[in-house]
Swiss-Prot record:
<feature type="binding site">
    <location>
        <begin position="135"/>
        <end position="138"/>
    </location>
    <ligand>
        <name>carbamoyl phosphate</name>
    </ligand>
</feature>
<dbReference type="Pfam" id="PF02729">
    <property type="entry name" value="OTCace_N"/>
</dbReference>
<keyword id="KW-0056">Arginine metabolism</keyword>
<dbReference type="InterPro" id="IPR024904">
    <property type="entry name" value="OTCase_ArgI"/>
</dbReference>
<comment type="pathway">
    <text>Amino-acid degradation; L-arginine degradation via ADI pathway; carbamoyl phosphate from L-arginine: step 2/2.</text>
</comment>
<dbReference type="InterPro" id="IPR006132">
    <property type="entry name" value="Asp/Orn_carbamoyltranf_P-bd"/>
</dbReference>
<feature type="binding site">
    <location>
        <position position="167"/>
    </location>
    <ligand>
        <name>L-ornithine</name>
    </ligand>
</feature>
<feature type="binding site">
    <location>
        <position position="317"/>
    </location>
    <ligand>
        <name>carbamoyl phosphate</name>
    </ligand>
</feature>
<keyword id="KW-0963">Cytoplasm</keyword>
<dbReference type="InterPro" id="IPR002292">
    <property type="entry name" value="Orn/put_carbamltrans"/>
</dbReference>
<keyword id="KW-0808">Transferase</keyword>
<dbReference type="GO" id="GO:0019547">
    <property type="term" value="P:arginine catabolic process to ornithine"/>
</dbReference>
<protein>
    <recommendedName>
        <fullName>Ornithine carbamoyltransferase, catabolic</fullName>
        <ecNumber>2.1.3.3</ecNumber>
    </recommendedName>
</protein>
<dbReference type="GO" id="GO:0042450">
    <property type="term" value="P:arginine biosynthetic process via ornithine"/>
</dbReference>
<dbReference type="InterPro" id="IPR006131">
    <property type="entry name" value="Asp_carbamoyltransf_Asp/Orn-bd"/>
</dbReference>
<dbReference type="InterPro" id="IPR036901">
    <property type="entry name" value="Asp/Orn_carbamoylTrfase_sf"/>
</dbReference>
<dbReference type="InterPro" id="IPR006130">
    <property type="entry name" value="Asp/Orn_carbamoylTrfase"/>
</dbReference>
Length: 337
């Protein structure tokens, strides 16, 4: 019998149907419950998992590692200094070697093409832990967190504030509209999402009944907001743009004034982390000294408020990643969704 997920890679949200994406979210909730009750779920007993990290990570590495162990698999971390992707060895050759030694591969790096080549040539499921274009495993955690708080996804309005061109904004647009979530991007015109991403999201929205709004008008952006979401102003590899981004994005900071504009006491705040909400980091101190800004994309007040759900969201990275690995590699009985 054909299995829906077995052997498939998880590279971008657009590769999955609404039903498939929603199934993974619900399966994640089930695995979270099993974990909470101490029920073993060793669906990947005896499997070996390669964790390839071109870009450093706290949550993604921790989530994949603990998820693999919970599933009975052995995770092996291979950092930027351990792998030769495209340097001394082609991605194709590396993929073919790793595919003979490992049962599944996670990749977190810069190029979407690279993760696609790993999937094409390795012969095993490959999971995208983040590229410059997409962040699909983050989306499962985000929308699971939203569903936990509201009991549904369809009809919810999510407002993303900040750099509208980054991977998180791209993925929020596509995954959200795929599942009937209204997605507002509140961003300066210079950082509006790419036109092809917006068109893709609008196509999904037409099918799901959702709507897409890309605007630099705060009153338009916050209308009907159930979820405020933000991300760092400067992504990995863009550190030279700090001054430009601080000046450009200060009006798009998530603060209590913005929260109150939504006039919804039941709304929640999400952030994929890390967050620059104070000066308790080297980056935070550096930005404060150079630009006079002590809080960047979110104020400390909002970050620590009753609206905040980002630590639930971070925990959900592990449960959702576990669901993806189990569904695609665990030979589970999932004939259709």
């Amino acid at each position: 019998m054909t299995q829906v997920f077995q052997g498939r890679s998880f590279l971008a949200e657009k590769d999955f149907s609404r039903e498939e994406f929603e199934y993974l979210i619900d399966f994640s909730a089930h695995l979270k419950d099993l974990k909470k009750r101490g029920v073993p779920h060793h669906y990947l007993e005896g499997k070996n998992i390669a964790l390839l990290f071109e870009k450093t990570s706290t949550r993604t590495r921790a989530a994949f590692t603990t998820a693999a162990i919970d599933l009975g698999a052995h995770p092996e971390y291979l950092g930027a200094n351990d792998i030769q992707l495209g340097k001394k060895e082609s991605t194709e050759d590396t993929a073919k070697v790793l595919g003979r030694m490992f049962d599944g591969i996670e990749f977190r790096g810069f190029s979407q093409r690279m993760v696609e080549e790993l999937a094409e040539f390795s012969g095993v499921p490959v999971w995208n832990g983040l590229t410059d274009e997409w962040h699909p495993t983050q989306m499962l955690a985000d929308y699971l967190t939203i569903k936990e708080n509201f009991g549904k996804l369809e009809g919810i309005t999510l407002v993303y504030c900040g750099d509208g061109r980054n991977n998180v904004a791209n993925s929020l647009l596509v995954a959200g509209t795929l599942m009937g979530v209204n997605v507002h991007i509140f961003s300066p015109k210079e950082l509006f999402p790419a036109e092809e991403i917006v068109k893709l999201a609008e196509g999904y929205a037409k099918e799901s009944g959702a709507h897409v709004l890309v605007t630099d008008n705060v009153d338009e952006a916050v209308k009907g907001a159930d979820v405020f979401y933000t991300d760092v102003w400067v992504s990995m590899g863009e550190e030279d743009k700090f001054k430009e981004r601080v000046e450009l994005l200060q009006p798009y900071q998530v603060n209590m004034e913005l929260i109150k504009k939504a006039n919804n006491d039941n709304l929640i705040f999400l952030h994929c982390l890390p967050a620059f909400h104070d000066t308790n980091t080297v980056y935070g101190k550096d930005v404060a000294e150079k630009f006079g800004v002590k809080e960047m994309e979110v104020t400390d007040e909002v970050f620590r408020s009753k609206y905040a759900r980002h630590f639930d969201q971070a925990e959900n990275r592990m449960h959702t990643i576990k669901a993806v690995m189990a569904a695609t590699l665990g030979n589970l009985f999932i004939p259709k969704v």
